[in-house]
């Protein structure tokens, strides 16, 4: 079972999920380095990319879930202000009040933190793409006769 299922059942597991993905990020960054046997690196690339891309997709799904929950929370506050406030408020006024609610602000901070984790993972996927490009070029150089190309 993945982190998406855990968080959708219990939102309090977000800090643990962030810590997990940060730890995985450190390992993923090590996988971005091109050292050692080129053939071995080339053989491992599809599995590495698949694993890390799946992790990125899980982060994206969690982020989407958090945004859905934020919209639900904002909607409940919006409704509260429209129905229970003493004077008539414009939609813009209500929006400003909702944006200032502590729960809404806290949720936006959580979403921002998860978005940062997602952006770091996007960087890892770009680095893995570059690694694949480098492997391809080293192989082409070897085919062209430059056997002494080292990493």
Go through each PLM region and give its residues:
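Short, charge-rich amphipathic alpha-helices with coiled-coil/heptad character
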Residues: 23-54
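Extended alpha-helical coiled-coil scaffold domains characteristic of the BAR superfamily
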Residues: 42-45, 49-56, 111, 116-121, ...
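Extended, amphipathic alpha-helical coiled-coil scaffold segments used for oligomerization/tethering
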Residues: 66-110
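Catalytic phosphate/metal-binding cores of nucleic-acid and nucleotide-processing enzymes, i.e., regions
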Residues: 60, 80, 122
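Long amphipathic alpha-helical coiled-coil segments
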Residues: 67-75, 106-141
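Extended, charged low-complexity scaffolding/tethering segments
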Residues: 1-30
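Acidic, low-complexity, intrinsically disordered peripheral segments
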Residues: 142-151
């Amino acid at each position: 079972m993945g982190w998406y299922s855990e968080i959708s059942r219990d939102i309090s597991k977000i800090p643990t999920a962030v810590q997990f993905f940060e730890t995985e990020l450190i390992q993923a960054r090590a996988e971005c380095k091109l050292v050692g046997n080129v053939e071995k690196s080339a053989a491992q690339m599809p599995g590495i990319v698949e694993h890390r891309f799946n992790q990125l997709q899980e982060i994206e799904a969690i982020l989407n879930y958090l945004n859905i929950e934020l919209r639900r929370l904002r909607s409940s506050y919006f409704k509260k202000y429209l129905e229970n406030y003493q004077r008539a408020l414009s939609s813009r006024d209500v929006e400003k009040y909702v944006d200032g609610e502590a729960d809404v602000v806290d949720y936006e901070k959580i979403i921002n933190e998860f978005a940062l984790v997602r952006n770091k993972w996007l960087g890892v996927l770009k680095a893995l793409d570059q690694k694949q490009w480098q492997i391809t070029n080293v192989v082409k150089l070897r085919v062209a006769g430059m056997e002494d190309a080292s990493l």
